[in-house]
């Protein structure tokens, strides 16, 4: 019984260390929306690697939709919209703006390319 009580703190420490490792491995990619384009226009990811997309806009409200990944966000000026994803298969996913932002809006698109 005494050994179990001594083992519990060690297991808790291991759990905390494991969570810290996962957070350290999470990539952060900044995506900027402005006047009919996203930067970067192509986002390259790896299967199984957690990523946080930090979405910002330099001019006005925009949308960021990736239908095949079930992502549909609004990007507000002066705010950061964070989207966490862990790609589970290699594929190319199209994204586009869903908030009409003027003539040229229909060209505001890009791709997420996930490799093995």
Model feature map: region roles:
Residues 1-9:
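Bacterial N-terminal signal peptides that target proteins for export
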Residues 8-17:
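Bacterial N-terminal signal peptides
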Residues 18-24:
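Sec/Tat signal peptide C-region and signal peptidase I cleavage site
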Residues 33-35, 49, 56-59, 68-70, ...:
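A mature extracytoplasmic/lumenal domain signature
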């Amino acid at each position: 019984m005494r050994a179990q009580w001594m083992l519990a703190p060690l297991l808790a420490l291991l759990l905390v260390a494991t969570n810290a490792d996962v957070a350290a491995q999470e990539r952060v990619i900044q995506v900027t929306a402005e006047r009919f384009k996203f930067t970067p226009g192509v986002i390259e990811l790896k299967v199984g690697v957690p990523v946080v997309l930090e979405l910002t806009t330099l001019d006005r409200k925009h949308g960021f939709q990736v239908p095949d990944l079930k992502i549909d966000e609004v990007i507000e000026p002066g705010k950061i919209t964070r989207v966490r994803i862990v790609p589970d298969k290699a594929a190319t996913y199209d994204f586009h703006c869903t908030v009409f932002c003027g003539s040229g809006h229909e060209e505001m698109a890009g791709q997420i390319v996930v490799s093995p």
